[in-house]
């Protein structure tokens, strides 16, 4: 409705007009006119009264009958006007309320928009504030498939649009250390950094995690030094940036361009307490070892003390250098030098990670710790880095190990390392003056010595082992108790090259009393010998060995020793120059340490929960005794290496001289005439063990010839020489593990079915073991395939497989069975097959009768074919004839004319009968020679038919399959 004036028809009540208007003033106007109208009604009523006698004056007034209906009508009109008056008043009130409500609603919308804008721009910090977090706080966040990772709550105003695009309502942006990854996390799933740093930093020993924790500790130190950084010496230390209330700060000795808000800077300045700092310095002066703990508070106080000294005292103290006659080194630092340096770490430059949904953080943390500890135990030998890096780490963490002993963790030791000052090298002289007990204080901190902190932290040269040995000697004079825990440190690093060699002498002193190398060092084993050798323990000492004897003994020694001598040759030369008194002192220290570890082991056996509060001590004890057991007891259970070597040579000798195996190998090779190189290769392989056996026998004769020259040594070595002889006899009599026993797998296909090719047979059966390539046959006439295996076990495995698989060659009913590849069984099978088939009976009897007529004495030894073929003699002439034998596989019927032409060969072979040995070895090839006649005839016919077939199909599009020929 519009606000224009609404006029109602005016009515005349007496002499007055009543006008209703729609505006606000119409209300009062109507009230005044209504009062005037009522007063007029009263006067009318008074005028229409009677006189004193009760008579009504009708002359000048209207009669009573006329005035009453008029009076009722006027009352009705008044009632209607009042009703309309209230309606108009209500309408005007609603209009006014509407006018008032519109600006109120608009103001409410503006307030809501402001609230939403504040929520988007930074009011999500209100949710973080409810959990006690602010922008810039350091936290631990749980990333999927990762342990709790250190990070800090990052201001999203500094993030790129791609990072802000994936933000979630009510979540905070967390930038992680190490890999510079980031993610949006619910504040309820974050935990503060400082209260949980001791627990969370020991989750795993991964290099990436250790790097992240190290960067987090670096940030903690920088924030501690931030409160003592000012613009007195460098006016560019605090530079405002585009974001309001934030500054780019360059803290000395730390990376440049660290972004902090004014609130963080003020908080860092307020956290510095001069009283507490002075008390900490006094406590360190009175009890340095008690003060030098690995807690986070102690680390922050040390950084604050160093920052206070840097802020108060001169930056370059010339008097200090003059007093100690040190060379003056000035850094040519300009006032604008920090502007030229770039920050080493770029936040949010990594990948986006997603948070892991946590049900119960406390129980989950406990489970994570148990899981990670077991995983760390499982992969403990594999978690070390290169040898050069481990040498640096060993030198840096040595002094912190004397306070935490075996309770320390490698990740915690690494994260507390103080990084080298960048571009401000003279300040390291100032720090060594007051605080000498730093977490990674090295020999460079000693006054008068050259500082080597930066060299230790950055030098990756492998030749650093000798330098670390010198530093260890220097530290032993300052901290005598420190060497007690050095063997345990070496145990943690025994997988690396340099550290395992550096501590090998101390470990072997404790295990067997043997040094690694050196002049005049005892060579014989003490603990690793068997029980038979221990009886000759009291024999007189050995004289100095000659060069040949020393080399032969090294060859008889274990492979592990040879490997250790070859790998640690350079280190042995360096260790030979160490003083003998220092070796004896190290031996005493190692023995004391061993007693302590032994007591811990006894306590652990009595109380299984011993060391449950500190898993690292339990790991060190267990690892030490594992290595001790492997060095002392493990190799004494097995046979001596010399016996093993001689037994292997005995196996080779038996395999070379066994007659039946050699005979079988020669009989089963069918294609040696066609491939002479294969025959030569087999000959060289067969006679190689003979040469090695000859060499072994020559060494044995040399040692036996040297026996009169060294009676004392032979007397001590009697058990060693006796045991290999016994083992060798046993090895000769007993069967070898893998004896070459050629076995043939025969597959009989139904007639008319397609047969697999030789390549297919090799591919199908090559997986089961080594095949005899020359024994693989495919016979199309008889529908038989043969596959030869060198070992019977492989053939049996293949038979089990093909018997269980019905679809190896399709849906074909194939019969499988094994056959021994012996000449007797092969010839017997051929004769049986020929006897079964009536077509081949006559061709077989004719050549046999002819042989009986021409050479009757030769038929008698034919009964002994089995025994002769099993044990052929050493005569090579017979072997050559055996090589040229071929079997008949096609089983084609034979004809006598061709066999008659070959009969002179058999008569010539039967000529040297007077010599019994030659006759025995020449007789067996007679029967295969007859088979050779049959094969030649069949091959001639086959070649003739092939020639005709090829001539017939020349120029045609197709060809006839081979089996139809």
Curated annotation (Swiss-Prot):
It comes from the Eukaryota. Residues 135-196 form the PWWP domain. Keywords: Nucleus, Transcription, Transcription regulation. GO terms for biological process: regulation of DNA-templated transcription. InterPro entries: PDP_family_Arabidopsis, PWWP_dom. A motif (Nuclear localization signal) lies at residues 546-553. The keyword Transcription regulation applies. Residues 437-507, 526-577, 649-708, 905-927 are annotated as: Disordered. The keyword tRNA-binding does not apply. SMART domains: PWWP. Pfam families: PWWP. Residues 437-455, 496-507, 657-676, 905-919 have a biased composition (Polar residues). It is found in: Nucleus. Residues 456-474, 481-495, 549-563, 691-702 have a biased composition (Basic and acidic residues). GO terms for cellular component: ESC/E(Z) complex. Its main location: nucleus. Disruption phenotype: No visible flowering phenotype. Belongs to the PDP family. Component of the PRC2 (polycomb repressive complex 2) complex which regulates histone methylation on histone H3K27. May influence gene expression by regulating the function of the PRC2 complex and modulating H3K27me3 level. This is PWWP domain-containing protein 4. The gene is PDP4.
């Amino acid at each position: 409705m519009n606000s224009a004036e609404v006029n109602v028809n005016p009515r005349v009540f007496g002499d007055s007009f009543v006008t209703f208007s729609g505006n606000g003033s119409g209300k009062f106007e109507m009230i005044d006119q209504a009062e005037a109208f009522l007063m007029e009604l009263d006067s009318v009523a008074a005028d229409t009264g009677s006189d004193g006698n009760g008579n009504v004056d009708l002359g000048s007034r209207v009669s009573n009958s006329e005035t009453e209906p008029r009076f009722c009508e006027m009352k009705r009109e008044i009632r209607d006007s009042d009703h309309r008056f209230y309606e108009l008043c209500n309408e005007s009130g609603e209009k006014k309320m509407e006018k008032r409500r519109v600006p109120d609603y608009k103001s409410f919308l503006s307030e809501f928009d402001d609230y939403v804008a504040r929520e988007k721009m930074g009011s999500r910090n209100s949710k973080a504030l409810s959990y006690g977090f602010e922008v810039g706080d350091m936290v631990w966040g749980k990333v999927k498939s990762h342990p709790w990772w250190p990070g800090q709550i990052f201001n999203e105003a500094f993030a790129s649009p791609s990072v802000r695009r994936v933000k979630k309502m009510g979540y905070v942006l967390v930038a992680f250390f190490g890999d510079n990854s980031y993610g949006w996390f619910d504040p309820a799933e974050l935990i503060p950094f400082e209260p949980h740093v001791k627990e969370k930093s020991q989750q795993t020993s991964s290099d990436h995690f250790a790097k992240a924790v190290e960067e987090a500790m670096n940030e903690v130190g920088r924030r501690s030094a931030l409160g003592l950084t000012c613009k007195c010496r460098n006016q560019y230390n605090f530079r405002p940036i585009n974001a309001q209330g934030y500054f780019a700060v360059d803290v000395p000795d730390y990376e440049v361009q660290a972004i902090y808000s004014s609130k963080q800077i003020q908080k860092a300045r307020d956290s510095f307490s001069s009283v507490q700092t002075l008390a900490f310095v006094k406590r360190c002066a009175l009890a340095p070892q008690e003060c030098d703990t690995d807690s986070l508070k102690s680390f922050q106080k040390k950084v604050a003390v160093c920052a206070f000294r840097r802020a108060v005292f001169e930056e370059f103290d010339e008097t200090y250098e003059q007093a100690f006659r040190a060379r003056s080194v000035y850094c040519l630092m300009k006032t604008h030098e920090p502007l030229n340096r770039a920050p080493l770490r770029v936040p949010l430059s990594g990948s986006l990670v997603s948070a892991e949904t946590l049900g119960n953080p406390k129980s989950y943390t406990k489970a994570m710790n148990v899981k990670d500890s077991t995983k760390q135990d499982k992969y403990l030998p594999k978690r070390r880095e290169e040898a050069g890096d481990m040498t640096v780490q060993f030198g840096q963490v040595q002094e912190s190990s004397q306070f935490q002993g075996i309770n320390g963790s490698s990740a915690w030791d690494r994260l507390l390392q103080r990084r080298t000052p960048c571009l401000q090298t003279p300040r390291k002289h100032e720090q060594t003056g007051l605080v000498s007990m730093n977490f990674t204080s090295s020999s460079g901190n000693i006054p008068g010595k050259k500082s080597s902190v930066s060299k230790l932290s950055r030098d990756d040269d492998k030749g650093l082992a000798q330098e670390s040995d010198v530093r260890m000697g220097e530290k032993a004079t300052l901290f005598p108790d420190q060497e007690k825990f050095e063997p345990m440190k070496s145990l943690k690093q025994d997988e690396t090259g340099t550290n395992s060699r550096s501590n090998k002498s101390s470990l072997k002193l404790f295990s067997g009393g043997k040094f690694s190398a050196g002049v005049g060092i005892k060579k014989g084993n003490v603990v690793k010998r068997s029980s038979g050798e221990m009886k000759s323990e009291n024999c007189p000492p050995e004289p100095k060995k000659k060069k040949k004897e020393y080399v032969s003994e090294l060859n008889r020694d274990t492979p592990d020793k040879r490997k250790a001598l070859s790998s640690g040759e350079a280190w042995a030369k360096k260790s030979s120059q160490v003083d003998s008194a220092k070796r004896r002192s190290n031996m005493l220290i190692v023995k004391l340490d061993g007693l302590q570890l032994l007591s811990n082991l006894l306590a652990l056996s009595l109380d299984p929960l011993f060391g449950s509060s500190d898993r690292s001590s339990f790991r060190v004890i267990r690892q030490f005794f594992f290595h001790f057991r492997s060095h002392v007891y493990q190799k004494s259970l097995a046979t001596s290496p010399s016996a093993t070597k001689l037994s292997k040579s005995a196996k080779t000798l038996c395999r070379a001289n066994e007659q039946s195996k050699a005979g079988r190998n020669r009989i089963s090779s069918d294609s040696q005439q066609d491939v002479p190189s294969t025959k030569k290769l087999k000959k060289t392989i067969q006679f190689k063990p003979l040469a090695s056996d000859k060499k072994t026998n020559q060494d044995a004769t040399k040692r036996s010839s040297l026996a009169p020259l060294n009676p004392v040594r032979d007397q001590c070595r009697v058990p060693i020489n006796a045991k290999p002889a016994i083992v060798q006899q046993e090895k000769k009599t007993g069967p070898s593990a893998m004896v070459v026993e050629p076995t043939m797998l025969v597959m009989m296909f139904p007639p008319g079915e397609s047969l697999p090719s030789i390549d297919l047979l090799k591919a199908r059966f090559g997986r089961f073991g080594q095949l005899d390539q020359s024994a693989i046959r495919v016979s199309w006439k008889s529908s038989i395939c043969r596959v030869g295996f060198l070992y019977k076990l492989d053939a049996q495995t293949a038979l089990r497989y093909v018997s269980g698989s019905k679809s190896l060659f399709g849906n074909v009913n194939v019969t499988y069975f094994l056959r021994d590849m012996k000449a007797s069984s092969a010839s017997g099978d051929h004769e049986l097959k020929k006897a079964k088939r009536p077509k081949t009976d006559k061709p077989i009897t004719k050549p046999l009768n002819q042989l009986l007529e021409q050479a009757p004495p030769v038929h008698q030894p034919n009964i002994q074919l089995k025994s002769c073929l099993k044990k052929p003699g050493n005569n090579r002439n017979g072997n050559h004839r055996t090589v040229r034998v071929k079997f008949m596989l096609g089983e084609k019927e034979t004809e006598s004319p061709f066999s008659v032409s070959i009969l002179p060969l058999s008569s010539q072979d039967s000529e040297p009968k007077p010599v019994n040995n030659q006759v025995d070895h020449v007789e067996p090839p007679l029967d295969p020679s007859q088979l050779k006649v049959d094969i030649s005839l069949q091959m001639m016919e086959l070649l003739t038919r092939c020639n005709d077939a090829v001539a017939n199909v020349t120029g045609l599009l197709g060809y006839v399959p081979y089996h139809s020929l």
